[in-house]
């Protein structure tokens, strides 16, 4: 459901034809290009999760940038809802982007990972 909403439905007809024909299309995002395969799109359609429930009592931590233009924060909130555990949290990094790769954001990610491991 994510890939259709966030990618496929935004592709032009030309892009859809190309990815079906070649099996891959390169999407430009900022200074980088990312290969998106048609297999990824098909797998996303087969593996829908938002209508499922995960009942294991496990710790779940999701980290998301508030300024993520690729995947809006609402999707992390939706995914978090499928976990029935009471030990779940969403950490929204203020002004964080999709990659969360700045030193400041990496420090937050490292802190959250340490909390999970310990």
Language-model regions, residue ranges each:
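The alpha/beta-hydrolase serine catalytic core
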Residues: 1-87, 92, 97-100, 104-110, ...
């Amino acid at each position: 459901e994510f890939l259709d909403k966030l990618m496929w439905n935004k592709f032009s007809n030309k892009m859809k034809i190309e990815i079906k024909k070649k099996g891959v299309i390169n999407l430009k995002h900022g200074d980088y290009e990312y290969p998106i395969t048609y297999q990824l799109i098909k797998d996303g359609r087969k593996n829908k999760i938002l209508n499922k429930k995960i009942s294991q009592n496990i710790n779940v931590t999701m980290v998301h940038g508030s300024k993520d233009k690729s995947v809006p924060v609402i999707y992390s909130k939706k995914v978090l809802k499928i976990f029935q555990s009471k030990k779940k949290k969403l950490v929204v990094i203020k002004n964080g982007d999709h990659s969360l790769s700045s030193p400041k954001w990496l420090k937050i990610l490292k802190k959250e990972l340490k909390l999970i491991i310990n």
